[in-house]
A protein has these predicted regions:
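Bacterial N-terminal signal peptides
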Residues: 23-35
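A residue-level marker of the well-folded mature domains of exported/periplasmic proteins
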Residues: 3-13, 37-359
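Positively charged n-region of N-terminal signal peptides that target proteins for export
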Residues: 12-22
Length: 359
C-alpha cells in the first residue's frame, strides 16, 4: 500500500529548499546594498593618495538653470582658478531628485574624488551618496542637515536662527498681527522646512496676535518662479484675510511680490524670504517688500569645495575651521553634531543696500 504521507516529503523538502534559497538571496541583496544605506564613515580615511593636480571635485546643485545656482557656479569657477584644482559644477536641468541622483551616478562612474551636493531631497539621495562613500568618494552636503550619507554638511548659519529672523522680518511688516502661511521650494527640502518650522515656532512664542493659516500651513512651489506667482495669487484670492507669506525659497519674493502688485494688495499683504538682490530689487525699491534675507551662493559653493579639499588633504575638521569665504571663516559644529558645520553668513537686504551686491 502506498503511503501518501511519504510521497509529500520530497515536496516538503523542495519547499524548504526554495525558502532557504529565497532567504539566502535576500541576505545577499542586503549585504550588497549595505553601502547604500546610512553608515558611519571616518573622514580621516578619505585622505587622498593622489597629487592635488589629479583631483576632480564636482558640485551638484538642485537645478543648473536656477539663478541661485548660476551664482553658485561663480564660486566654483573662482575656487578652481585660485587653487588650480579641477573643480566644476554639474546639475540637473530642473529641480528633480531623480535627475539629481542620475547626475551623481554619472559622476561616480567618472571616478571623481569628491562630490559636493545641494540636495533636492536628502532621503532620495541616500542610496546614491552611500554608493559614492563606499567607493571612497568624499561627500559634502549644503542645505542637507538631515543627510546621513555625507561626511559633513555645511550651513551658512543656524537653520533655527535664520527661520526666526525671517519671522521677525515678516512680523514687523504685518504689525505683529494677522494670518500668514509658509512657502517652501519643495516639501522634501530639509533646510526650507527647518527654516519654516523655526519661524512658526518663534511666532507662536512671540507674536500671539499672528495666526498660521490652518487650511494651508505649508505651500510648495517646486522651486519655480511661475509656480510661486500662481500659488500666491491663488492663496490671496482664496483667503481674503491672508496677510503674509513667510518664504524660504529664493523665488518666494519675486513670485509673491508680483502677485501682490497685480492684486492691488501692496501695503495690505506682505512677503519675505531668502532671495537674490537683483531678483528682489524691484519689489524692495517700490515698497512691496521691506527686505529679504540672503547669503551669497557664490561663497557657499566656494566653502563646500574648500571643505572637500580639507578632507582630501587629511585635515582634521574642528571648530574654527576657515573655509576662506566671507561668513564661512570660523565654522562651528551645531549643538550635538559632529557632522553639521555652521557659519555666520546671512545678510539683510533692504533699500539701503540692495544695489551694492552686483548680482
Amino acid at each position: 500500500m502506498i503511503d501518501l504521507h511519504q510521497l509529500s516529503i520530497p515536496r516538503r523538502r523542495k519547499t524548504v529548499k526554495r525558502t532557504l534559497v529565497i532567504f539566502a538571496s535576500l541576505a545577499l541583496v542586503f549585504m550588497l546594498a549595505a553601502p547604500l544605506f546610512a553608515q558611519s564613515y571616518d573622514p580621516m580615511k578619505f585622505k587622498s593618495s593622489k597629487p592635488q593636480s589629479a583631483w576632480k571635485i564636482a558640485l551638484v546643485p538642485k537645478d543648473a538653470t536656477n539663478a541661485w545656482f548660476v551664482r553658485m557656479e561663480v564660486g566654483v569657477k573662482q575656487f578652481a582658478k585660485e587653487t588650480g584644482i579641477n573643480a566644476f559644477q554639474k546639475g540637473p536641468a530642473k529641480t528633480d531628485a531623480a535627475m539629481q541622483a542620475q547626475v551623481i551616478e554619472d559622476l561616480i562612474a567618472q571616478g571623481v574624488d569628491a562630490i559636493c551636493v545641494v540636495p533636492v531631497d536628502p532621503s532620495a539621495l541616500e542610496p546614491v551618496l552611500g554608493e559614492a562613500l563606499s567607493k571612497g568618494i568624499v561627500v559634502i552636503d549644503h542645505e542637507g542637515a538631515s543627510q546621513q550619507n555625507c561626511l559633513y554638511d555645511i550651513e551658512a548659519f543656524s537653520n533655527q536662527g535664520l527661520g526666526e529672523t525671517i519671522m521677525q522680518e515678516l512680523a514687523k511688516m504685518m504689525g505683529q498681527k494677522g494670518t500668514y502661511t509658509t512657502m517652501v521650494g519643495n516639501v522634501t527640502n530639509a533646510s526650507h522646512n527647518e527654516w519654516a518650522d523655526a519661524g512658526v515656532a518663534y511666532q507662536k512664542a512671540h507674536y500671539p496676535n499672528m495666526t498660521l493659516l490652518a487650511a494651508e500651513p505649508r505651500v510648495e512651489i517646486m522651486d519655480n518662479l511661475d509656480t510661486a506667482y500662481q500659488r500666491a495669487k491663488e492663496l490671496f484670492k482664496k483667503y481674503p484675510n491672508l496677510k503674509g507669506i513667510l518664504g524660504t525659497s529664493s523665488l518666494s519674493v519675486p513670485g509673491t511680490g508680483r502677485a501682490i502688485e497685480e492684486l492691488g494688495l501692496k501695503g495690505k499683504a506682505f512677503v519675505t524670504a531668502v532671495g537674490l538682490p537683483n531678483e528682489c530689487a524691484p519689489f524692495i525699491k517700490n515698497g512691496t517688500v521691506d527686505g529679504v534675507l540672503h547669503w551669497d551662493p557664490r561663497d557657499a559653493g566656494y566653502a563646500q569645495l574648500a571643505t572637500a579639499v580639507a578632507v582630501l588633504k587629511g585635515q582634521k575638521i574642528a571648530n574654527g575651521l576657515n573655509l576662506k569665504a566671507p561668513g564661512w571663516t570660523s565654522m562651528k559644529f551645531a549643538a550635538g553634531s559632529t557632522k553639521v558645520l555652521q557659519g555666520q553668513g546671512w545678510i539683510t537686504i533692504n533699500k539701503a543696500n540692495v544695489d551694492t551686491f552686483g548680482f
